[in-house]
Design a protein with these regions (language model features):
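Metallo-beta-lactamase
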Residues: 2-5, 99-148, 193-199
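Active-site neighborhood of phospho(di)ester-bond hydrolases with catalytic His/Asp-centered motifs
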Residues: 45-47, 69-77, 97-100, 159-163, ...
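Active-site metal-binding motif and surrounding structural segment of the metallo-beta-lactamase
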Residues: 40, 51-98
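Short, charged N-terminal beta->alpha structural module
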Residues: 247-269
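Metal-dependent phosphodiesterase/nuclease catalytic metal-binding core
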Residues: 36, 150-213, 221-248
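Conserved beta-strand hairpin/beta-sheet module of binuclear metal-dependent hydrolase folds
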Residues: 2-61, 150-153, 157-161, 255
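Short acidic active-site motifs
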Residues: 84, 282-286
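FMN-binding flavodoxin-like domain, especially the glycine-rich phosphate-binding loop
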Residues: 171-212, 216-219, 261-276, 286-384
Length: 384
């Protein structure tokens, strides 16, 4: 695939994968992106996941047209991008591996010492001339590993962004809008590191970027302000859309009835409601919704003097990603000693700028008329 006159795509699509990073459902597969800049000197940008080494090397050989690469630039050492460094070195032993000090530490950890006979350790802001193209290296630590760096090509105004601006899905399954699966990817993979992403966005703002070449998902061109704006909202923990995320667990269906009634009452008032059964839905989508919308209602049962396990897991996903700047409400259920609301609220005690609505709904086993009235009040409060 030709990206520009000099930049070629040599990545692969993975349709066999069911769980990315062992946890994220990817029904449309995954793309592992790799690029080549053809110039007086040739630079290969990253490798691909382990199972696709031969396909990747064949793609590379096809675009080289008899030439040999001069550099392999490693932006990110996670194995879905670095697993074939050894195959590359064996195929092209004269090529130079380009990374930073942390990159080479990780290469030694993954492959053992001595793999890279020819290597170039770069620092933040260093440049590398390929001829017409000059690359500037921009370090992006903890977006989302400590060694991550990006490259900016001044000639084609291309930012090679590592995992930033990536999304789930193979490239031959990209009919859907970018936002949804990019959001789920960001919240799951990068969401904890908002401060670090903000630092990268400031660096990017000083560059004249015409295209973004991520390690997952499509190359981004055209009006890049849309993608930059979303990344700014996500990484500053801002509210992307007005609405209420309702996440619930239910043992015998009674808490579910309360959650569904709340969703109905919200929609009757013209408020967007996104509802998730945490035991059955893709939890990553529920996490995505919790960060997308400005308000969150958690509904669960008291369980073993604690809360239902899926709800505890969900809240952990939120708090470990620095959940903040939101309005929260609670629906609890308990037959003899309801304590879920108190427990859930305590789990957010270290979260910043969390506001709690006045209404908490407490079910004692099953829904009552009084509970329905309380849910009406909750819906009214959430829609103000």
């Amino acid at each position: 695939m030709t990206i520009t006159n000099d930049i070629r795509y040599i990545g692969v699509n993975d349709h066999d994968i069911d769980l990315f990073e062992g946890q994220y459902i990817v029904p449309e597969g995954m793309a592992y992106n790799s690029y080549v800049i053809i110039d007086e000197k040739i630079a290969v940008m990253d490798t691909v996941s382990a199972d696709f080494g031969e396909e990747w090397l064949a793609n590379l050989e096809n675009v080289l047209a008899g030439r040999k690469p001069d550099y392999l630039i490693i932006h990110h050492m996670e194995p879905d991008h670095s697993a074939n460094i050894d195959k590359f070195v064996n195929a092209y032993p004269e090529a130079t591996i380009v990374g930073n000090a942390k990159t080479f530490e990780m290469i030694d950890q993954f492959f053992g010492r001595g793999l890279c006979k020819n290597k170039l350790a770069v620092k933040n802001g260093d440049t590398l001339s390929l001829g017409r193209h000059e690359l500037t290296f921009l370090f992006a630590p903890m977006v989302h590993w400590p060694e991550v760096m990006m490259s900016y090509d001044e000639t084609d105004k291309a930012l090679f962004s590592a995992d930033a601006f990536g999304k789930f899905g193979a490239l031959d399954c990209q009919d859907k809008e970018w936002d949804c699966e990019a959001r789920r990817y960001y919240m799951g993979i990068v969401g904890k590191y908002g401060m670090q992403v903000q630092a990268v966005l400031k660096k990017a703002a000083a560059l004249d970027i015409k295209m973004i070449c991520p390690l997952h998902g499509p190359v981004l061109t055209g009006d890049l302000s849309h993608y930059m704006s979303l990344y700014d909202i996500w990484s500053s923990y801002g509210v992307e859309s007005e609405g209420v995320c309702i996440a619930y667990t239910s043992v015998y269906g009674n808490t579910k009835k309360a959650a569904e009634l709340l969703a109905k009452k919200l929609e009757e008032r013209g408020c967007k409601a996104a509802i998730s059964d945490l035991a059955r839905c893709d939890m990553a989508e529920a996490v995505e919704d919790a960060f997308r919308y400005g308000k969150l209602v958690l509904a669960t049962t008291t369980y073993n003097a604690d809360i239902f396990p899926f709800m505890r897991q969900f809240i952990d996903h939120l708090t470990e990603r620095n959940y903040q700047n939101r309005t929260l409400g609670f629906i609890e259920n308990g037959t003899w000693a309801p304590a879920a609301a108190k427990i859930m609220k305590a789990m957010f005690e270290k979260s910043k700028n969390i506001n709690y609505i006045d209404t908490t709904v407490t079910l004692r086993s099953a829904m009552t008329d009084e509970n329905a009235e309380a849910i009406e009040r909750m819906a009214e409060e959430l829609c103000r």
